[in-house]
Structures are given as structure tokens and as C-alpha cells.
Amino acid sequence: MAAGHGHEHGHEHGHGHGKMELPDYRQWKIEGTPLETVQKKLAARGLRDPWARNEAWRYMGGFAGNITFPSVILKGFKWGFAAFVVALGAEYFLDSQNGDKKHH
């Protein structure tokens, strides 16, 4: 195969694949999270978890909310109820259209 016709590794082919930008690792802090307690307990035994920071994202931002039984049960209720109302309206509308045809 001639040069430039195959999929050579390391070259961009215009598909929008560029270098992926990773977030700065220093933004993730374990201070004030349950991971800090784990690190302290490990330190008391002379140990340390060097990868704890990789789990810190779980305790920050939108991921940090408490999970409760009602939140699990009601998750998606708003969109589910909206879909139910749309389906009910469509069913009512289609039934009324068919009802008109039956009487004529």
C-alpha cells in the first residue's frame, strides 16, 4: 500500500480526533470527604493510599448528593409523569378520532 493511503498511527485524519485534555489532578481534594478519614486511619497504621485522589470526584459537585430511599424511588418521576400525560392525551385524541368514524 502506498504511503498516505492507510491509517498510519499518530497522524490526524480530519475526523475531529485531537489530543484529549485531561482535568488538572490538583482540583480533586480529599480534605473534607470520607476519604480523608480513610487516609487518617491508614496513616495510623503507617500506610497511605496514593490513589485516593482519584476517587475524590465522587464527593464533589453533582455527584456529592446523599442517596436516600425516596430519591431512588422518585428518580425520573417528573419525566415519567410527563410521558404518561402525553401518552394519555395521544390515546384520548386517537380514540376520539376513531369514535367519530364508527358513528358515521
UniProtKB/Swiss-Prot annotation:
Principal location: mitochondrion
GO annotation terms (biological process): aerobic respiration; electron transport chain; proton motive force-driven mitochondrial ATP synthesis
Function: Accessory subunit of the mitochondrial membrane respiratory chain NADH dehydrogenase (Complex I), that is believed not to be involved in catalysis. Complex I functions in the transfer of electrons from NADH to the respiratory chain. The immediate electron acceptor for the enzyme is believed to be ubiquinone.
Keyword Transmembrane helix: yes
Lineage start: Eukaryota, Metazoa, Chordata, Craniata, Vertebrata
Chain ranges passing through the membrane: 72-90
UniProt PTM: Methylation at His residues by METTL9 enhances complex I-mediated mitochondrial respiration.
Record-listed N6-acetyllysine modification sites: K29, K40
Topological type in the membrane: Single-pass membrane protein
GO cellular component annotations of the record: mitochondrial inner membrane; mitochondrion; respiratory chain complex I
PANTHER family attached to this UniProt entry: NADH DEHYDROGENASE [UBIQUINONE] 1 BETA SUBCOMPLEX SUBUNIT 3 (PTHR15082:SF2), NADH-UBIQUINONE OXIDOREDUCTASE B12 SUBUNIT (PTHR15082)
Cystine connections: none
Modified residues (N-acetylalanine): A2
Domain of life: Eukaryota
Keywords: Acetylation, Electron transport, Membrane, Methylation, Mitochondrion, Mitochondrion inner membrane, Respiratory chain, Transmembrane, Transmembrane helix, Transport
Chain positions found as Pros-methylhistidine: H11, H13, H15
Modified residues (N6-succinyllysine): K29, K40
Region Disordered: start-end pairs: 1-20
Protein name: NADH dehydrogenase [ubiquinone] 1 beta subcomplex subunit 3
Oligomeric form and interacting partners: Complex I is composed of 45 different subunits.
Compartments reported by the entry: Mitochondrion inner membrane
Family: Belongs to the complex I NDUFB3 subunit family.
